[in-house]
């Protein structure tokens, strides 16, 4: 089991990042790959979850061990695979997710890509009362939109749209939030976070 990978951010795309560790490039799928964009050519630590199936071997990466723990718990729910787990983590703040599960708010849970009423109900049945260790108190800044000034980038919005598609959002859903995003000058990472906040309203 690989606990973490530490190295340089070599490549960022809508679905994954590549970490260069001593000349070996690790392809790591993350909730929002563009959150690593401003760390290009710097050393980062990515906590990994190794997903092994008969026809699949993949690494999923997170900035904190707590985020990885939440991902692992989501995978225990029938109907949620790695892609769905990443989409849920990218879309919401952890306290929103935990609150929705604890309050049995199926309507909120169904807003996540690929989550229907059956899966939402299963999330509640499987996870209610089991997420107390994974709350905002444990990692209060996780997923929060950073207040730092954005670096203008001509294709930032286009990259964000591709990232949303990679998370499973339909074109028609994305286009609903594009007009408001076009009024702002943000980094790709911030565009993604802003869009996800609006999609969950």
From Swiss-Prot:
Region (Domain II) location: 64-142
One Gene Ontology biological process: DNA recombination
Subcellular location: Cytoplasm
Keyword flag DNA damage: yes
Swiss-Prot/TrEMBL keywords: Cytoplasm, DNA damage, DNA recombination, DNA repair, DNA-binding
GO function terms (MF aspect): ATP binding; four-way junction DNA binding; four-way junction helicase activity
Gene3D superfamilies attached to this UniProt entry: 5' to 3' exonuclease, C-terminal subdomain, DNA helicase RuvA subunit, C-terminal domain, Nucleic acid-binding proteins
Ranges for region Flexible linker: 143-153
Pfam families documented for this protein: HHH_5, RuvA_C, RuvA_N
Region of interest (Domain I), residue spans: 1-63
Family designation: Belongs to the RuvA family.
Subunit structure: Homotetramer. Forms an RuvA(8)-RuvB(12)-Holliday junction (HJ) complex. HJ DNA is sandwiched between 2 RuvA tetramers; dsDNA enters through RuvA and exits via RuvB. An RuvB hexamer assembles on each DNA strand where it exits the tetramer. Each RuvB hexamer is contacted by two RuvA subunits (via domain III) on 2 adjacent RuvB subunits; this complex drives branch migration. In the full resolvosome a probable DNA-RuvA(4)-RuvB(12)-RuvC(2) complex forms which resolves the HJ.
Name the UniProt record assigns to this protein: Holliday junction branch migration complex subunit RuvA
Organism: Geobacillus sp. (strain WCH70)
Gene this chain is encoded by: ruvA
């Amino acid at each position: 089991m690989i606990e973490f990978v530490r190295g340089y951010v070599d490549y960022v795309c809508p679905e994954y990042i590549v970490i260069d560790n001593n000349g070996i490039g690790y392809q790591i799928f993350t909730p929002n790959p563009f959150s690593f964009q401003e760390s290009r050519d710097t050393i980062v630590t990515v906590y990994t979850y190794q997903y092994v199936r008969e026809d699949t071997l993949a690494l999923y990466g997170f900035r904190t061990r707590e985020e990885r723990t939440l991902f692992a718990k989501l995978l225990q729910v029938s109907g949620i695979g790695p892609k769905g787990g990443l989409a849920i983590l990218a879309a919401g703040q952890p306290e929103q997710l935990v609150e929705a599960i604890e309050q049995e708010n199926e309507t909120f849970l169904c807003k996540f890509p690929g989550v229907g009423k059956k899966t939402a109900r299963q999330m509640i049945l499987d996870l209610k009362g089991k997420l107390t260790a994974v709350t905002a108190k444990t990692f209060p800044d996780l997923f929060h939109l950073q207040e730092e000034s954005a670096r203008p980038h001509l294709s930032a919005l286009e990259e964000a749209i591709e990232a949303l598609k990679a998370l499973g959002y339909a074109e028609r859903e994305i286009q609903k939030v594009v007009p408001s995003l076009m009024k702002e000058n943000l980094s790709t990472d911030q565009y993604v976070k802003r869009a996800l906040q609006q999609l969950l309203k």
